[in-house]
Amino acid sequence: MPSQMEHAMETMMLTFHRFAGEKNYLTKEDLRVLMEREFPGFLENQKDPLAVDKIMKDLDQCRDGKVGFQSFLSLVAGLIIACNDYFVVHMKQKK
């Protein structure tokens, strides 16, 4: 039986490939749909209507309009770090 971490890894891989399809990368539209479906709270809290455009620009280091799996993981890691920072601050406030 997979551990929670193994399940989390599998979920990230499956999510990327579900939105990337056979082409094995995300386009800006793929990324927008993924963000809307998988990170709805993040997008709802963004004040900038161009948030997905800016994220795509940051992730698309080759400037070819494609986001590969490693860049997708960078996005997920950044979001996890931000969530952890928020969590730590709020845990300290509860003490």
From Swiss-Prot:
<dbReference type="InterPro" id="IPR011992">
    <property type="entry name" value="EF-hand-dom_pair"/>
</dbReference>
<dbReference type="GO" id="GO:0042803">
    <property type="term" value="F:protein homodimerization activity"/>
</dbReference>
<dbReference type="GO" id="GO:1900026">
    <property type="term" value="P:positive regulation of substrate adhesion-dependent cell spreading"/>
</dbReference>
<feature type="modified residue" description="N6-acetyllysine">
    <location>
        <position position="57"/>
    </location>
</feature>
<dbReference type="GO" id="GO:0001558">
    <property type="term" value="P:regulation of cell growth"/>
</dbReference>
<dbReference type="GO" id="GO:0001765">
    <property type="term" value="P:membrane raft assembly"/>
</dbReference>
<dbReference type="GO" id="GO:0009986">
    <property type="term" value="C:cell surface"/>
</dbReference>
<dbReference type="GO" id="GO:0009410">
    <property type="term" value="P:response to xenobiotic stimulus"/>
</dbReference>
<dbReference type="Pfam" id="PF01023">
    <property type="entry name" value="S_100"/>
</dbReference>
<feature type="modified residue" description="N6-acetyllysine">
    <location>
        <position position="23"/>
    </location>
</feature>
<protein>
    <recommendedName>
        <fullName>Protein S100-A10</fullName>
    </recommendedName>
</protein>
<dbReference type="GO" id="GO:0045944">
    <property type="term" value="P:positive regulation of transcription by RNA polymerase II"/>
</dbReference>
<dbReference type="GO" id="GO:0045121">
    <property type="term" value="C:membrane raft"/>
</dbReference>
<dbReference type="GO" id="GO:0042789">
    <property type="term" value="P:mRNA transcription by RNA polymerase II"/>
</dbReference>
<dbReference type="GO" id="GO:0050767">
    <property type="term" value="P:regulation of neurogenesis"/>
</dbReference>
<dbReference type="GO" id="GO:0045595">
    <property type="term" value="P:regulation of cell differentiation"/>
</dbReference>
<feature type="domain" description="EF-hand">
    <location>
        <begin position="47"/>
        <end position="82"/>
    </location>
</feature>
<feature type="modified residue" description="N6-acetyllysine">
    <location>
        <position position="28"/>
    </location>
</feature>
<dbReference type="GO" id="GO:0072659">
    <property type="term" value="P:protein localization to plasma membrane"/>
</dbReference>
<dbReference type="InterPro" id="IPR002048">
    <property type="entry name" value="EF_hand_dom"/>
</dbReference>
<dbReference type="GO" id="GO:0010756">
    <property type="term" value="P:positive regulation of plasminogen activation"/>
</dbReference>
<comment type="subunit">
    <text>Heterotetramer containing 2 light chains of S100A10/p11 and 2 heavy chains of ANXA2/p36. Interacts with SCN10A. Interacts with TASOR.</text>
</comment>
<dbReference type="GO" id="GO:0006900">
    <property type="term" value="P:vesicle budding from membrane"/>
</dbReference>
<feature type="modified residue" description="N6-acetyllysine">
    <location>
        <position position="54"/>
    </location>
</feature>
<dbReference type="GO" id="GO:0051496">
    <property type="term" value="P:positive regulation of stress fiber assembly"/>
</dbReference>
<dbReference type="GO" id="GO:0005509">
    <property type="term" value="F:calcium ion binding"/>
</dbReference>
<dbReference type="GO" id="GO:1990665">
    <property type="term" value="C:AnxA2-p11 complex"/>
</dbReference>
<dbReference type="InterPro" id="IPR013787">
    <property type="entry name" value="S100_Ca-bd_sub"/>
</dbReference>
<feature type="region of interest" description="Ancestral calcium site">
    <location>
        <begin position="60"/>
        <end position="71"/>
    </location>
</feature>
<dbReference type="GO" id="GO:0005737">
    <property type="term" value="C:cytoplasm"/>
</dbReference>
<dbReference type="GO" id="GO:0051894">
    <property type="term" value="P:positive regulation of focal adhesion assembly"/>
</dbReference>
<dbReference type="GO" id="GO:0090575">
    <property type="term" value="C:RNA polymerase II transcription regulator complex"/>
</dbReference>
<dbReference type="GO" id="GO:0044325">
    <property type="term" value="F:transmembrane transporter binding"/>
</dbReference>
<dbReference type="InterPro" id="IPR001751">
    <property type="entry name" value="S100/CaBP7/8-like_CS"/>
</dbReference>
<keyword id="KW-0007">Acetylation</keyword>
<dbReference type="GO" id="GO:0048306">
    <property type="term" value="F:calcium-dependent protein binding"/>
</dbReference>
<dbReference type="GO" id="GO:0098797">
    <property type="term" value="C:plasma membrane protein complex"/>
</dbReference>
<comment type="function">
    <text>Because S100A10 induces the dimerization of ANXA2/p36, it may function as a regulator of protein phosphorylation in that the ANXA2 monomer is the preferred target (in vitro) of tyrosine-specific kinase.</text>
</comment>
<dbReference type="GO" id="GO:0005886">
    <property type="term" value="C:plasma membrane"/>
</dbReference>
